Amino acid sequence: MSDVLPPNSTIPSSNVPRAPSKWWREPELALLLVLVVGAYFTRIPALTIRGEESRRGLIAREMLETGDWIVPRCQGVPLFSRPPLQNWLIAVAGSFRGGVDRFSLRFPSDCAILLTVLMIYGYARTFLSKLGALTAGAAYASMGQVVELGRTGETDALFTLLVSGSLLVWHVCQVRGASPYKTWCLGYLLAALGTLTKGPQAPVYFAGTVGIYLLFTRQWRFAFSRAHVAGIATFCAVYGMW
């Protein structure tokens, strides 16, 4: 008997990878939280302003002062070298602190690192043991460049969260047999937010990686569907709102 499934058949539910229903209560995840909070949140304002942080802070400050959250400006001059999502988050953090300072400048990046680690752990638990998921999350949190850039007000940490999120969320939905509309729309939603963070690299990374995966696994027909069109429309709607 052939082991190849008929074209319209589905994988038996018993063979579909699923994360434990309460993986967020596992002590290994708590250990990761302690690691990230200790490494990233305890000394947020300790470093001096460096790199592009000053520009990010000035743009966020002008957003708060002028009330114009659409056009990013630095010293009154429109600046479109980077989309504004990172600046929005810095400005929101600054509004709770009475102004943009080193804490509000870096807090969004630290939160992005934390959320990325949580996402990696949850994704890994779909396929790996607790130890494997712990290792995956700790490996990301302790990477040299992540530690360096994750403690600054640069866009890299947030961009990584959104682009990796678009890929991991799409893949989890796809392997679990979620609605194709949910799969594509969530993936493109996160890719659109990534575009609002750093530019058009996000949809290239998302579509390119997903396309190669579908070709490699011989599931390329999954890309030719109304659900995929709905996902692209979601991307255009989210990015177009800016």
Predicted regions: what is each one?
Residues 2-242:
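Membrane-integral, polyisoprenol-dependent glycosyltransferases
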